[in-house]
Regions:
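Hydrophobic membrane-insertion alpha-helices, especially the h-region
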Residues: 17-28
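Flexible, low-complexity segments enriched in proline/glycine/serine and punctuated by aromatic residues
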Residues: 6-10, 16-19, 33-149
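Positively charged n-region of N-terminal signal peptides that target proteins for export
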Residues: 1-5
Length: 149
């Protein structure tokens, strides 16, 4: 009888150990799943920041909205915005110009004449996978002094 209780104890301990290992495996699976999700979000945000910074530099280098379109257009990935002055450009997941890409960059171009020159207000919004809310938004302004004033 004593041998039987030792074997039963062994089975109970083994069963408890298996349950503990299964719980640990489930917990680690959830942790790694959440880490993968956070990594994907971080990659999207990083890509959006790069695209918005590039757009801000293009705004600074442009005299007109047409110049901005010429700077952002590669492989026919950019086109003028229909509802306001500005440019929409599309990029793939590796940030290469692609008309059907996952990233959409909308850059507004709102010039305002002042007594000394022109102030251009611009907003670069990056959306991913046709989402309504932008992943990243960057406001920028540039001033061009009029020659002879």
């Amino acid at each position: 009888m004593k041998k039987h209780s030792h074997i039963t104890g062994f089975y109970v301990e083994t069963l408890m150990m298996i349950v503990v290992f299964l719980l640990i495996i489930l917990l680690l699976t959830q942790v790694f799943g959440l880490a993968q999700m956070q990594s994907t979000k971080a990659k999207r945000l990083n890509g959006a920041v790069v695209l918005a910074q590039n757009a801000a530099e293009a705004v600074a280098a442009s005299e007109t909205a047409e110049d901005l379109l010429a700077l952002l257009n590669e492989n026919d990935n950019a086109f003028p915005m229909t509802d306001t002055a500005g440019v929409t450009a599309c990029y793939d997941s590796e940030l290469n110009p692609d008309a059907g890409g996952t990233y959409r960059l909308d850059v507004t171009w709102l010039p305002e004449k002042t007594e000394n020159g022109t102030m251009v207000h611009s907003m670069a919004e990056v959306r991913c996978d046709d989402a309504e809310a932008p992943v990243y938004r960057l406001e920028t302004e540039r001033f061009r002094m009029e020659v002879g004033t």
